[in-house]
């Protein structure tokens, strides 16, 4: 990726068959490389990568191949409808902005790790612009018109099943509203607190608003675990999704695998841990499917040895976690850092019905 930047001046956005397609949203190289760096994989030129990230994050839109609609995002904190796509049916402004928020949060994490305090503060603040899109009336994120008003009329279910919907790409407002992995607590406050957050998230699953066949809402099941006492909902929903949509039949995944994303979701979920925020080295835990999994790590980066994930689960009906240990010590949290995992190395789950 860094070589691509050296060759033509930009990080890849959606490279396919050795060519850039400019498909989809965001600035994805930032969270990918930041994630690697913060997990200890540092055999590359991080300063050159940072140079590339700053270019895409600060270059004016007319000269910015990575973020062509950056100007209003920087000036207002959001991207209004019609700024980049005059045809409303092809406008993906909210989706674009959400990806930029995630990328900017990752850039803030990297800047902090590199000792660039001013950059870290700037990009963290930019990553919180999602709040502009939240509509109390609909209880969802909502596209914003050029004059700053919310799109009206508005149905948060529009856009489901890949139908056209102003503001959102391949999904509805429900598929995107909880896509704030870097500020879950902030989103909870917007929604009226933890209870309201959980109820609204459960509403998505109970009313068929979650789309298991595409990526925007792929991490939704793991958000329940961000509220103490509600972790069982994560365990229940993940188990139900694995059972219903991931099988050994020819159509064994619910949608396009998209470079392995759906398969990766299934594998991580089956192992019992899921990377819940791009660019932040953390995992949310859930009930594993396997009795034992060994992750062989490169001793160059992880000299303490491999990771072993084990469980006493003997029946599919044992959906819920009773207790967990990491490195032989009791775990009291359902979210652990990459460092805690690689240093503890032995993660064990005791489960129950």
Describe every region a protein language model picked out.
Residues 26, 30, 40-304, 308, ...:
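Active-site core of glycosidic bond-cleaving carbohydrate-active enzymes
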Residues 317-323:
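Beta-strand-rich binding/interaction modules
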């Amino acid at each position: 990726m860094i070589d691509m930047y050296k060759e033509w001046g930009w990080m890849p956005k959606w490279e396919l068959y050795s060519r850039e397609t400019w498909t989809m949203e965001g600035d994805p190289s930032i969270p990918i490389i930041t994630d690697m760096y913060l997990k200890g994989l540092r055999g590359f030129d991080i300063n050159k990568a940072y140079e590339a990230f700053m270019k895409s994050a600060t270059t004016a839109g007319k000269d910015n191949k990575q973020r062509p609609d950056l100007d209003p995002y920087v000036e207002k904190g959001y991207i209004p409808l019609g700024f980049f796509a005059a045809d409303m049916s092809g406008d993906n402004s909210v989706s674009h902005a959400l990806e930029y928020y995630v990328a900017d949060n990752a850039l803030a994490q990297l800047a902090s790790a590199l000792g660039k305090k001013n950059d870290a503060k700037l990009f963290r603040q930019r990553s919180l612009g999602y709040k502009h899109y939240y509509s109390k009336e609909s209880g969802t994120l909502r596209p914003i018109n050029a004059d700053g008003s919310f799109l009206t009329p508005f149905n948060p279910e529009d856009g489901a099943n890949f139908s056209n919907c102003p503001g959102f790409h391949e999904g509805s407002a429900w598929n995107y509203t909880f896509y704030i992995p870097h500020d879950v607590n902030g989103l909870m406050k917007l929604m009226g607190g933890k209870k309201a957050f959980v109820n609204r998230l459960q509403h998505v699953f109970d009313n068929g608003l979650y789309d298991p066949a595409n990526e925007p809402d792929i991490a939704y099941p793991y958000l329940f675990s961000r509220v103490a006492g509600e972790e069982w909902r994560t365990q229940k929903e993940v188990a139900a999704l694995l059972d219903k949509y991931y099988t050994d039949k020819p159509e064994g995944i619910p949608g396009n695998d998209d470079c392995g994303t759906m398969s990766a979701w299934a594998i991580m979920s089956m192992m019992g841990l899921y990377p819940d925020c791009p660019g932040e080295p953390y995992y949310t835990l859930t009930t594993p499917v396997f009795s034992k999994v060994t992750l062989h790590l490169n001793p160059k980066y992880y000299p303490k040895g491999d990771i072993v994930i084990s469980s006493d689960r003997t029946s599919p009906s044992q959906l819920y976690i009773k207790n967990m240990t990491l490195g032989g010590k009791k775990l009291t949290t359902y979210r652990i850092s990459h460092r805690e995992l690689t240093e503890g190395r032995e993660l064990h789950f005791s489960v129950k019905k």
